[in-house]
């Protein structure tokens, strides 16, 4: 009985506590717990059924097509193969139809409407962003709270630095470092032995260097290199608490300046050290450094003193003011580590010579030397013997500042570090170091956690932007078109004659334009509206921003939001990260350079089709009855629809044959600009291409069909030949694009011709029938390419308003359905893409591999897009040739 009482009392005491715990969980947390439990139970099967995003995408589209056909078939107003064909076209935005859409009833049209909205690229990739956001919250504990605390800390320290500098923003850079340093309110005390005017802190003191005199050190026996020796005893060395921060700061400046002077006169060997800087490379030969020694009474703090003094307030103020001045020669590459490892061989009678040392980043490094870099630390004099001395702005000195000062004004002629890039805003408390495509190099555990928090907040904001974008532009589309369809009586009558309400026609057409479906509720598509500029112009806009122009519009919106957001806000931090590193968060958001290239490509392709239409069909019989202004608009509308949407404003079968060939080619390349942009901005681009070479530079891997650059001036041909033999050719950005194109062609061509071959077998009798001249191989190829490009254009068949596919047999229609599903997956990223991979141990391993790869290789400069660099280089060479040619004439 007493035992029962004790049990009940314990239960009664524990119950309120358990209820409080359950009460604290939000509905979102409970939903995530339910999803997590369900996924854990399905994990043994799911990892085989859904191994990656590509397979999930295939399964989703096929499932949606089957579900759509099941929902459409109960009306039984058409054969099941035609219903399946329509559902597959809706789920892939193919736009081909074996039966006019207006012949289906309202229920079936609504089903097509919903299926299309659930399968657009924006929705699928946006849903993937939501999944990654959910996984971030499940995989990282308290990531939301930690990232918020880091943001508050960065903002507080930034405001404090602005207050210390006496100004805000860029005005802090106008005050010199020396004037700021020796003000009483910044420095707690002055060095009694030296005045402020004697030693400017932005340059090393030459008198201090001249005061160095020999320090004789002898040993009774030669010490082994693997035994750690104690540093020499300085008679006047002060305790760490007695050393003025200015002394240690000047020591660092002297060390760095002497390193720079040694760069021009010596070539040092670099050993294999994984902790070295990512941009230092290994030389083949070792040289002894010049003999020098330190004065016995000179003061040079040890590394332990550096660690302690670097954390003091006064030293951090000094360094903060130094950074405010804008000189980032020494402290802007925080993640870089300058490791000096001494290889000592000192005899008994030798004086303390500067030992040979090594400094290298990785076990295997390239033999190339970084050019045009002023701060390459190759040598560092030292007075210590048999001791490993390291200088690391982040780890050795613990200089992990929690705020960035205002951005320094770049001095004229100053060449930026090829691995560093100025951040859009202070979303990190340290200056990151990059490789190709936003690869962060040399991160500590604390930095990775901070970066993960910033990426999480950026992804969370991006999800909100995507949701508003998708819903908002769909609403804007039908708000734009529905009132016009209801108020223009002439066109309202045309719509009603097709058995459709003008209001519903406006809703469906707006969705079809923004989703690039290409179906219309009028039997002749948009031919009846060839003289209505209002819907044609707005539909072109929604067609572009709903598909290939989506990354351009999305980045433009984020840029506008960034420019108008409040300074030092969490909102602006996230926007800045999205602008700087978009492909770490989303597959359809690109950096500035690739975005401009995508924009240029779209303009060129559309302009090419438009110009060809004007040249070849402007005065043809099919458009002659329309005014010239409307003809130009029809040509522009058709050129825009040819690549993605599939609407037609003119009968394509009556156009010039060369225009038909041009349209077929444009349908095939429709997805290539977007697909290549996705793949060449992939964070793991090299690994996705299979470039795992670690013994040489990433840029030295070439393909056989790359164009070899030649010297058109005829100079140094023999030298170029020798250099080509001695070292590998340099990998150009064009080579990566070529690799992506070759992969895409190998993915496409065999499938296209296999489908064409099967259809020609099934439709052989119709092709041979002389009474059906419009049923020919070219028309079938046009249909196959249209399906594979998920465009929806068709040459049609005489006296019908449907696609040519309506004349196919059941097997041929199944082949077209397979083309639609396969073609819809053309523009997906590679399996190895950070933007589609969920946070996991596997992702951490890939990041670690990428970091090790980057540390040992000289990656491309990140300040400029590689394709832009390539084009500039080629244009400069062409300009040089043209100048020489015209100079002779």
Curated annotation (Swiss-Prot):
Compartments in which it is found = Membrane
Q: List UniProt keywords, sorted A-Z.
A: Glycoprotein, Ion transport, Membrane, Potassium, Potassium transport, Transmembrane, Transmembrane helix, Transport
Q: Report the record's Gene Ontology biological process terms.
A: intracellular calcium ion homeostasis; intracellular potassium ion homeostasis; potassium ion import across plasma membrane; regulation of membrane potential
Question: What is the gene name?
Answer: TRK2
Q: Which loops or segments lie on the Cytoplasmic side of the membrane, by the record?
A: 1-51, 102-109, 488-499, 546-548, 606-609, 679-743, 798-889
Provide GO CC annotations from the record.
cell periphery; plasma membrane
Q: Where are the transmembrane segments?
A: 52-73, 81-101, 110-130, 465-487, 500-521, 525-545, 549-569, 585-605, 610-630, 658-678, 744-764, 777-797
How does the record classify its membrane topology? Multi-pass membrane protein
**Glycosylated residue positions:** 216, 233, 265
This chain belongs to the protein called Low-affinity potassium transport protein
Residue ranges, compositional bias (Low complexity): 207-219
Predominantly, its location class is: membrane
GO molecular function annotation? high-affinity potassium ion transmembrane transporter activity; potassium ion transmembrane transporter activity
Task: Cite the source lineage.
Answer: Eukaryota, Fungi, Dikarya, Ascomycota, Saccharomycotina
Q: Which residues lie on this side of the membrane: Extracellular?
A: 74-80, 131-464, 522-524, 570-584, 631-657, 765-776
Q: Summarize the protein's role.
A: This protein is required for low-affinity potassium transport.
């Amino acid at each position: 009985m007493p035992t029962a009482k004790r049990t009940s009392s314990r239960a009664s005491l524990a119950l309120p506590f358990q209820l409080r715990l359950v009460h604290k969980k939000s509905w979102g947390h409970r939903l995530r717990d339910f999803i997590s439990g369900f996924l854990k139970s399905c994990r043994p099967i799911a990892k085989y059924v859904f191994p990656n995003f590509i397979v999930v995408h295939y399964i989703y589209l096929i499932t949606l097509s089957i579900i759509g056909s099941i929902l459409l078939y109960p009306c039984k107003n058409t054969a099941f193969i035609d219903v399946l064909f329509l559902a597959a076209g809706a789920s892939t935005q193919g736009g081909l139809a074996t039966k006019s859409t207006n012949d289906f009833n309202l229920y079936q049209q609504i089903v097509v409407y919903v299926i299309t909205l659930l399968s657009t690229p924006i929705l699928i990739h946006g849903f993937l962003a939501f999944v990654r956001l959910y996984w971030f919250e499940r995989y990282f504990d308290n990531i939301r709270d930690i990232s918020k605390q880091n943001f508050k800390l960065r903002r507080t320290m930034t405001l404090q630095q602005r207050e210390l500098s006496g100004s805000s923003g860029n005005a802090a850079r106008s005050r010199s470092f020396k004037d700021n340093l020796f003000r009483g309110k910044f420095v707690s005390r002055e060095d009694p032995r030296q005045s402020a005017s004697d030693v400017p802190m932005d340059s090393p003191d030459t008198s201090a260097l001249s005061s160095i005199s020999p320090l004789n050190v002898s040993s009774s026996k030669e010490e082994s290199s693997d035994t750690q020796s104690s540093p020499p005893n300085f008679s006047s060395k002060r305790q760490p608490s007695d050393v003025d921060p200015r002394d240690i700061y000047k020591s660092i400046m002297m060390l760095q300046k002497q390193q720079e002077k040694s760069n021009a006169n010596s070539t040092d060997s670099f050993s294999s050290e994984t902790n070295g800087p990512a941009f230092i490379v290994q030389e083949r030969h070792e040289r002894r450094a010049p003999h020098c020694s330190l004065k016995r009474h000179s003061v040079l703090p040890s590394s332990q003193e550096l660690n302690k003094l670097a954390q003091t307030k006064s030293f951090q103020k000094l360094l903060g003011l130094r950074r405010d001045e804008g000189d980032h020669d020494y402290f802007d590459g925080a993640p870089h580590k300058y490791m000096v490892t001494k290889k000592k061989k000192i005899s008994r009678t030798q004086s303390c010579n500067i030992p040979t040392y090594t400094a290298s980043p990785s076990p295997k490094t390239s033999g190339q030397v970084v050019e045009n870099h002023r701060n390459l630390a190759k040598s560092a004099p030292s007075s210590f013997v048999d001791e490993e001395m390291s200088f690391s702005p982040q780890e050795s000195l613990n200089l992990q500042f929690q705020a960035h000062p205002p951005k320094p004004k770049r001095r004229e002629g100053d060449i930026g570090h090829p691995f560093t890039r100025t951040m859009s805003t202070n979303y990190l408390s340290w200056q990151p170091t990059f490789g190709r495509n936003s690869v962060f190099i040399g991160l500590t555990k604390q930095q990775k956690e901070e970066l993960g928090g910033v990426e999480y907040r950026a992804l969370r904001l991006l999800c909100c932007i995507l949701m508003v974008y998708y819903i908002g532009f769909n609403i804007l589309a039908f708000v734009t078109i529905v009132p016009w369809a209801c108020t223009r009586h002439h066109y309202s009558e045309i719509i009603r004659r097709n058995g459709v309400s003008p209001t519903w026609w406006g809703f469906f057409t707006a969705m079809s334009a923004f989703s690039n479906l290409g179906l219309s509720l009028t039997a002749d598509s948009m031919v009846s509206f060839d003289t209505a500029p209002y819907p044609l112009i707005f539909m072109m806009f929604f067609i572009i921003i709903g598909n290939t122009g989506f990354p351009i519009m999305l980045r433009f919106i984020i840029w506008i939001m960034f420019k108008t957001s409040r300074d030092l806000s969490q909102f602006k931090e996230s926007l800045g990260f999205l602008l700087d590193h978009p492909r770490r968060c989303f597959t359809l958001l690109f950096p500035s350079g690739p975005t401009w290239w995508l924009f240029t490509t779209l303009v060129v392709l559309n302009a090419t089709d438009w110009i060809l239409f004007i040249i070849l069909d402007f005065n043809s019989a099919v458009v002659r009855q329309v005014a010239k202004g409307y003809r130009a608009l029809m040509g522009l509308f058709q050129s825009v629809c040819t690549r993605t949407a599939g609407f037609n404003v003119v009968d394509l079968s009556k156009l010039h044959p060369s225009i038909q060939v041009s349209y077929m080619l444009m349908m095939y390349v429709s997805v290539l600009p977007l697909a290549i942009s996705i793949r060449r901005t992939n964070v793991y681009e090299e690994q996705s291409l299979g470039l795992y070479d670690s013994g040489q530079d990433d840029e030295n891997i070439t393909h056989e069909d790359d164009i070899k650059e030649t010297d058109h001036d005829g100079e140094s041909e023999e030298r170029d030949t020798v250099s080509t033999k001695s070292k590998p050719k340099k990998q150009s950005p064009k080579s990566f694009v070529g690799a992506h194109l070759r992969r895409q062609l190998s993915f496409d061509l065999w499938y296209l011709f296999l489908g064409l071959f099967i259809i020609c077998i099934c439709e052989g009798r119709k092709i041979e029938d002389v009474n059906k001249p419009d049923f020919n191989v070219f028309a079938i190829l046009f249909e196959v390419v249209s399906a594979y490009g998920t465009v929806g254009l068709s040459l049609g068949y005489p006296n019908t308003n449907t696609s040519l596919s309506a004349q196919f047999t059941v097997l041929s229609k199944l082949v077209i359905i397979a083309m639609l599903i396969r073609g819809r997956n053309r523009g997906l990223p590679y399996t190895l893409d950070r933007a589609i991979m969920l946070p996991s141990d596997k992702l951490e391993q890939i990041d670690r591999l990428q970091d090790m790869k980057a540390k040992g290789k000289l990656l491309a400069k990140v300040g400029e897009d590689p394709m832009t660099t390539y084009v500039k280089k080629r244009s400069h060479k062409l300009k040089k040739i043209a100048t020489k040619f015209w100079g002779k004439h």
